[in-house]
Swiss-Prot record:
Residues 1-17 form the signal peptide. This is Putative subtilisin-like proteinase 1. It comes from Encephalitozoon cuniculi (strain GB-M1). GO terms for cellular component: extracellular space. The keyword Secreted applies.
Length: 465
């Protein structure tokens, strides 16, 4: 009797998922050194991966890879890795409801019969057929990136100021199939519905036609903005150097630029170099870049870290608090400390019933029954913190039209300029008084910080006199 021994190949199936890996890189490093470090980190990360695991999306300071939980744990222990986070779903923060003025020598423009949200941000007392006052040239020279479902860039509201930036949704057309992104863009920079009237709108598609997506796509969108921001920074430096040379400056001075706002020269400081520095100082060397994130999902450390990283490069972020009627600190990007997080307020200056709250919310802005642009060249009324955040994005662009604030400074300025309105609602929506703040005069009464550009308007008037 022959005993046949059969050797069986046992295949162990390990569950793999998409993980976001962020490197512990300093954004102030010069680009050459950062590139070397990044390539080295990628090489070492690939050595950690198993043969059936792979890196998919690469970003400025990290990547997305399909790997097992055990590999992710090993990756976390690498000294160059800041964090490893499982990719997670995100979606729009909007709730659907189907239902210009004249120049002044003061530098202020009035739009009559403006949408109530604009009137409120401009400080108008009458919100019914109210007037919206805003600085002349508001938004000029500012690029606002709308990371969303896309933007209908041909919509009449944008008057040629909108362009397509990038599309990170696989197998989807380069257009807004939903309407949410177009609505947000209209609140930011529409000629009738916008807080600013001259800002440039750049569409970055990270959500599909259903308003859904993944955190990894958002990170790709942020990475795209970083690359465009750094490219514009180089262009500004080159323009400043050209201005110096055209004014008779020495052409034998070699400038070494590392992507930051500092220079190193190949020869000691001389009067000619000082003239170059003076020429450069007359330029706004930091591009004026704003990102609107009217999206949300559960708190994600990788997304918050990416926003902080980009903010350190000079990019301003406005995020929606979310519509769960819960603590905004439990969601991203609303929990980001580097962004300005906006909750939704009503025309009665109360917190909208759906808005998230808590200490992570910096200001409240109009978010109920907001009229703005929609796909198909139409307009629509929509509610949500998705509509509140674009009011803040527009305000950021308005401030940047006149002042060169870095993100931290401007966040403090906008919070400081907010109007503190007594909350008359009976809904104890957070139950902790973490936010809104108790009144200094009556601890039983709460104050809502409502987004307002009144103080900016006063500064512009004084500046124009």
């Amino acid at each position: 009797m022959i005993l046949a021994i059969i050797s069986l190949s046992v295949v162990i199936c390990r569950e793999v998922s998409d993980y976001i890996v962020m490197f512990d890189q300093d954004p102030s490093m010069d680009r050459a050194s950062m590139k070397v470090l990044y390539n080295m980190n990628i090489h070492e990360a690939q050595n950690i991966l198993r043969p059936d695991e792979s890196i998919g999306i690469k970003m400025t300071n990290g990547f997305v890879a399909r790997m097992s939980e055990s590999t992710a744990e090993r990756m976390k222990r690498h000294p160059s890795v800041k964090m490893v986070v499982k990719d997670s779903p995100v979606g729009i923060s909007g709730l659907k409801f189907d239902v210009p003025g004249s120049d002044d020598r003061s530098g202020i423009v009035m739009q009559r019969h403006a949408p109530w949200g604009l009137a409120r941000v401009g400080g108008s007392v009458s919100l019914v057929h109210g007037n919206y006052c805003y600085p002349i040239n508001s938004g000029k020279g500012v690029d606002v990136y709308v990371l969303d479902t896309g933007v209908e860039i041909e919509h009449p509201e944008f008057g040629g100021r909108a362009r397509w930036g990038a599309n990170f949704v696989p197998k989807s057309p380069d257009r807004d199939e939903h309407g949410h992104g177009t609505h947000c863009a209209g609140v930011i920079g529409g000629k009738n519905f916008g807080v600013t009237k001259e800002s440039s709108i750049i569409a970055v598609k990270v959500l599909d036609k259903y308003g859904s997506g993944m955190t990894s796509r958002l990170l790709q969108g942020v990475d795209f903005v970083i690359k465009e921001h750094e490219k514009k920074k180089d262009e500004l430096y080159n323009a400043a150097a050209d201005e110096y040379l055209s004014s008779g400056g020495s052409s034998d001075i070699e400038i070494e630029m590392d992507g930051s706002e500092s220079f190193s020269f190949v020869q000691p400081e001389t009067p000619s170099i000082q003239r170059l520095v003076d020429a450069i100082s007359r330029k706004a060397l930091q591009p004026k870049t704003v990102v609107n994130l009217s999206v949300g999902g559960f708190r994600n450390a990788a997304l918050n870290f990416a926003i902080e990283y980009a903010s350190r490069l000079g990019i301003h972020f406005s995020t929606a608090a979310g519509n769960e009627h819960e603590d905004a600190c439990d969601f991203s990007p609303g929990s980001s400390r580097a962004a300005i997080t906006t909750g939704a307020s009503t025309y009665r200056d109360t917190v909208a019933f759906f808005s998230n709250f808590g200490k992570c919310v910096n200001v409240f802005a109009p978010g109920v029954d907001i009229l703005s642009s929609w796909i198909g060249g139409t307009q629509k009324i929509v509610s949500g913190t998705s509509m509140a955040a674009p009011h803040t994005s527009g305000a950021i662009a308005a401030y940047l039209t006149y002042y060169d604030y870095d993100p931290h400074m401007l966040k403090s300025r906008i919070i400081g300029d907010a109007r503190l309105i007594e909350d008359v609602s009976e809904d104890d929506y957070d139950g902790t008084t973490i936010w809104p703040l108790p009144s200094l005069f009556n601890a039983n009464k709460k104050k809502l910080p409502i987004l307002s550009m009144e103080r900016l308007l006063r500064r512009v008037r004084n500046k124009m006199r």
